[in-house]
Design a protein with these regions (language model features):
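Short glycine-rich, Thr/Ser-proximal phosphate-binding strand/loop in the N-terminal lobe
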Residues: 2-43, 54-55, 128-130, 134-135
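Short glycine-aspartate micro-motif
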Residues: 2-6, 56-60, 91, 109-113
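Short glycine-rich anion-binding loops that position phosphate/pyrophosphate groups of nucleotides
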Residues: 10, 64-67, 116-119
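Short beta-strand scaffold segments in enzyme catalytic cores
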Residues: 12-17, 101, 112, 118-123
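A glycine- and small-aliphatic-rich helix-loop capping segment at beta-alpha/alpha-beta transitions
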Residues: 19-21, 76-84, 109, 125-130
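Short beta-strand-loop/turn "lid" adjacent to the catalytic site in phosphate-handling enzymes
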Residues: 49-84, 91, 103-104
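Conserved phosphate-binding catalytic cores of ATP/NTP-utilizing and phosphoryl-transfer enzymes
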Residues: 87-111
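Glycine-rich phosphate-binding loop plus the immediately following alpha-helix
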Residues: 128-156
Length: 156
């Protein structure tokens, strides 16, 4: 079995794929490696994750606050996730990489995320080669859920 985890600041979807290719999703609170301590990440996994832990061979974790821009946070997250699942293979990188791989596959293209925060990139089919760093969902990623909600509440 392997897991593909898609994590933003609001929620994490853990997609467990078994040997027959059947995928089952489980949800926890969001895990943002930059904004959370290793203890708080452990708490989310221990208290909220209800999927299988045994027999997991690989975890592919795509998350906010992960990737080359945040090496220390990514290493911390990888250590906690690996300890929790005890898997032999672990990849922890940006949620933007997940978006680019899902949208573009192995082709070049532009990929975006519009969630609690917003982000975009140019992907060359292998890696992200251009990215304007977002300000973060608190400061105002225009088009994000946080900004749209602020605008709605301001009009009420």
């Amino acid at each position: 079995m392997y897991i593909i985890a898609d994590s933003g600041s609001t929620k994490t979807q853990w997609c467990v794929v078994d040997a027959q290719g059947v995928a089952t999703s489980y949800f926890t609170s969001g895990i943002n490696a930059v904004m959370m301590t290793s203890e708080s990440i452990k708490a989310v996994l221990t208290d909220e994750y209800t999927g299988p832990k045994e027999g997991i061979e690989a975890v592919y974790f795509y998350g906010a606050g992960c990737g080359p821009a945040f090496p220390a946070a990514t290493a911390t997250l990888a250590e906690v996730v690996n300890e929790f699942f005890g898997c032999s293979k672990l990849e922890a990188t940006s949620d933007l990489v997940a978006s680019a791989r899902a949208v573009c596959g192995h082709e070049a293209g532009i990929a975006c995320i519009l969630g609690t925060g917003a982000n975009s990139c140019y992907y060359d089919g292998t890696e992200i080669v251009k990215n304007v760093r977002p300000l973060g969902f608190i400061l105002g990623d225009e088009g994000s859920g946080a900004v749209m909600c602020k605008k709605l509440l301001a009009d009420v």
